[in-house]
Structure formats: C-alpha cells, structure tokens
Amino acid sequence: MEGRITQVMGPVVDVDFDSYLPAINEALDVNYDIEGHPKKLVLEVAAHIGDSRVRTIAMDMTEGLTRGTKVVARGKSIEVPVGEQVLGRIFNVVGDVIDGGDELKEPVKWSIHRTAPTFENQSTKTEMFETGIKVVDLLAPYSKGGKVGLFGGAGVGKTVVIMELIHNVAFKHSGYSVFAGVGERTREGNDLYHEMKESGVLDKVALCYGQMNEPPGARNRIAFTGLTMAEYFRDEKGLDVLMFIDNIFRYAQSGAEMSALLGRIPSAVGYQPTLASEMGKLQERITSTKKGSITSVQAVYVPADDLTDPAPASVFAHLDATTVLNRKIAEKGIYPAVDPLDSTSRILDPQVVGEDHYKTATGVQQVLQKYKDLQDIIAILGMDELSEEDKRVVERARRIEKFLSQPFFVAEVFTGSPGKYVTLQETLEGFKGILEGKYDQIPENAFYMVGGIDEVLEKAERLKANA
C-alpha cells in the first residue's frame, strides 16, 4: 500500500499508487527528512483524479517534501485518542499531544469521521440546561444538546464567558468539556490553557488546537477532532458534555481555502460550493441522544459585521440560541456584557420553560426596551420631565441592568470578589420581585455584582450601616 508523491502545491499533495486506491478521507503517512531532522506528515485523501492517483490535503506544513517521496496508506482515516486520558491535555489535529507532557499510555482511538446519530437514537425532548449565569438562564436559556452562538468583538469577554461555562459544568454538573480552537491565535490558546490551570478547571476539559498559522487542512479537521472526543463521553459514558468551538467562522474559511486549492469552482463571495453541506456535516453530529448530550457553544466571528455573509449565515440555520456580547454594556462595567435585548433563544417558550419563567423574561425585556426608548428624552430633558410611571420604569430598569451583572468564579483572581452560581429559581425570584416593585426602596448599588436577591438585601444592609 505504498505510493509516491507526484506533485506538491502548498497544502495540496498528489500521490500516485500502483496497485491500490485509497478511499476518500483515508489517512496517508509520509516520513521524510528536512535538513537531517526526521519529520512525520499526515495527508488525507480528498479526491480521486484518475489512474490510481489521489489528491490529498496535508495536515501540517509541506516544506521539504519532494516528488518521488514514499507515502504509506493506513487503510483507515485519522484516529484520535478519546476517554478520560485526554482531559487536561492539548492535542493537535492528528491526536498528538502538544503540551510538552508525557505521551498517553495505550489510549482508545476513534476515527474523526463518524456518522451523525440516527433519528431513532436522537432524543427529542427539549430540556433547559442551567448555566448558573443569571442573564443567560433568564433571557436566552440554553437547551440540553442545543447549539449556542456566542457573538462578540475583541475584548468584550467571550473567553471569560466560555471559561465560566466550563467551570460551572465541571463543578455543578460534574461534567466534562471539550474546547476546539479552530484557526485560533496561538497566543489566545496559550492564555486559555494557563488561565484554566490557574482557575482549577483544566482537569475537566480536553483542548484541541488547530492554529491560525497551520495549513487549512489542520484548521478544518480540528473541529472533528474535538467533536470525536466529546462524542466518546456522550456515547460511551452517557454524559452531558459541553463542546466549545472558537471560532466556527474559521472552519468555513479553511474549507473555502481547501476547496479552491482542490480546483473546485467557487460559489458566492468566493466560498466553497459545498459550504452548507460541510457545515451540516459538523453540526448534525452535535446533538442529544438517548444516552447523553453534547451542548455546544460556538463563537462566531462576523466578517465586516455583515450578518448576510454566507459563512455566518450558514451557521445561523443550526443555532438554538444566541448570546450577544455588547461593548457598550462592557463599558458600563456590567459583566458578563450580554445584551439582554439582542440575545435570543428558541426555548424561551412557555411550553418549554413554563409560564412563570416566560412572563418574567418578557417582563424584564419590556422594561429594558422602554428604558432604551426613554434614553433620548432623559439625555435632552433630564429625569424630572418624565411622568411618574416612566420614572418608575427607569428606576426598575436600572436595578435590572445592575442585577444582570454577576461575579464569575474564573475572574476571582482579578476582581477579588468570590464567584456566584445562581440557580434558575433564585434568578426568577429576584427579577420577579424587581418587576413587582418589592425592591424599589433598595439602593441601585446593592444590585451590582451579586448572586441572588438575598445577597442584594445583605449588601443593602451593609451599605446602610456604612452610610
């Protein structure tokens, strides 16, 4: 099952086999030397181009490759380690450990190309997934086995929200998480690893990185590497796993690069003609089965803030909820900087979350929307010109805004205030009370950076004593 390289075009390599034709997605190994240093390269078959020749995508840089170099077919696709051993470690696309630690001891390996669960194995019941983050649980709740898009620019706190979710899943649901860095900056990946180490969540998460400087094959397939690790925990261990993909746009982008190099005719805006089916192939595997679930949070970069761009548009079709981070909210010092009016969820429906939750959430949104509408009047004429009714709305909206902030466990190191996990019951009680006017006499400051409503009352007492 040996072949020879006949052509190298950047990350695309053509290989000629004499008596064997490897299947699509089969892995091929190349061992060669660069200036006396041995190098191992993995290729993946992407197309058959006639006469027992195949066109492949390289999973690493191809410098130093020459025509005539020997290639060995594996007879199977890329396989990566799965199971408890992968927790706390960093892997590359082909499943090699890249954190400088010891190699894994005889790990179980699974192929990264797997079929999505069949209809009969999928679970159809919609359950809410409690995150312990007030603004998310109240206004844009996540569903178990659902897909969430996390939208935000640079520096508004996407990574901190991701780390807090990993923390809460690890400690409250005693579950595991998998993080796939797709086209990540190496620095960000490095920071994330060290921050997780410091905040004590590293031993509950597996990290897979395909960085920005790597060829498109590695950046594309890394999403499957991470997903395969998550699928093992779901299917073999029956767990509810959290899967993070940062950034899903880079998955589509790397597919576009590969498509052009493989000689396919580009589609709208230069993207690959197979964009929708490639996205579907990945997203359909992220689902709940009767054994367990994979809930995914996907950071979405929106090129030039254009939501109609084919790449983000292809993601929208798959999302159940969107969490939008807003710089203006971050500037007010309200963290997490989730936009309560822009974030949406498919399960914010009385039939799923119940009448009580639905009424409270819509009540909060109405008050915040009214406050937003009144802001121009306040800016020009001041608060005194408002009617008594409007003044009351503004005061309650400001309390709600402050109460939507929350101290995070993973930010304790920086803020000095202990993190808080707020149950859905506490969240609903607090916001219902504010809407009903129970806490109109309590100063606004008491609502800022606390957990449940009991803490607001304690903080108000402290403020009173210090006054």
Curated annotation (Swiss-Prot):
SMART domains: AAA. It comes from the Bacteria. This is ATP synthase subunit beta. It catalyses: ATP + H2O + 4 H(+)(in) = ADP + phosphate + 5 H(+)(out). One of its GO terms (cellular component) is proton-transporting ATP synthase complex. Keywords: ATP synthesis, ATP-binding, Cell inner membrane, Cell membrane, CF(1), Hydrogen ion transport, Ion transport, Membrane, Nucleotide-binding, Translocase, Transport. HAMAP family: ATP_synth_beta_bact. Produces ATP from ADP in the presence of a proton gradient across the membrane. The catalytic sites are hosted primarily by the beta subunits. It is a peripheral membrane protein. Disulfide bonds: none annotated. One of its GO terms (molecular function) is ATP binding. It comes from Wolinella succinogenes (strain ATCC 29543 / DSM 1740 / CCUG 13145 / JCM 31913 / LMG 7466 / NCTC 11488 / FDC 602W) (Vibrio succinogenes). Its EC number is 7.1.2.2. ATP binds at residues 152-159. NCBIfam families: atpD. The gene is atpD. InterPro entries: AAA+_ATPase, ATP-synt_VA_C, ATP_synth_F1_bsu, ATPase_a/bsu_AS, ATPase_alpha/beta_chains, ATPase_F1/V1/A1_a/bsu_N, ATPase_F1/V1/A1_a/bsu_N_sf, ATPase_F1/V1/A1_a/bsu_nucl-bd. Belongs to the ATPase alpha/beta chains family. It holds the Pfam family ATP-synt_VA_C. F-type ATPases have 2 components, CF(1) - the catalytic core - and CF(0) - the membrane proton channel. CF(1) has five subunits: alpha(3), beta(3), gamma(1), delta(1), epsilon(1). CF(0) has three main subunits: a(1), b(2) and c(9-12). The alpha and beta chains form an alternating ring which encloses part of the gamma chain. CF(1) is attached to CF(0) by a central stalk formed by the gamma and epsilon chains, while a peripheral stalk is formed by the delta and b chains.
